[in-house]
Amino acid sequence: MIYLHIGGGVGDLDSSTNYRDGFSEFVKSKNDKNKKIFIVEANPANIKKLKRSWKNFKNVKIINIAITKNNVGKKIFYYSEKDAPHYQLFSSKKTCYETLSRFYN
């Protein structure tokens, strides 16, 4: 079985979600030794915790990229340090980021 999670965040290590993540819970509960897991996360600030979340699973590939409808090469993303340490607010559109970041002021 192949599992793909787009937008992995920090997996099940986010205290703001009570350390729960539906994808992580579902996949980790499956007793399938042949499963392959691909997790895509655009925010590099989340990768270290995401790797820690999946450290006991050998068939996991964590990919630090953003997925877009067009091949745009490098892209600037906006996030707020006030949203640390899990950075739920993350956008490629500055106007969207500015609107949402008001919740953290």
Identify the residue ranges that each predicted region occupies.
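Phosphate/nucleotide-binding beta-alpha loop and adjacent structural elements of enzyme active sites
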Residues: 1-105
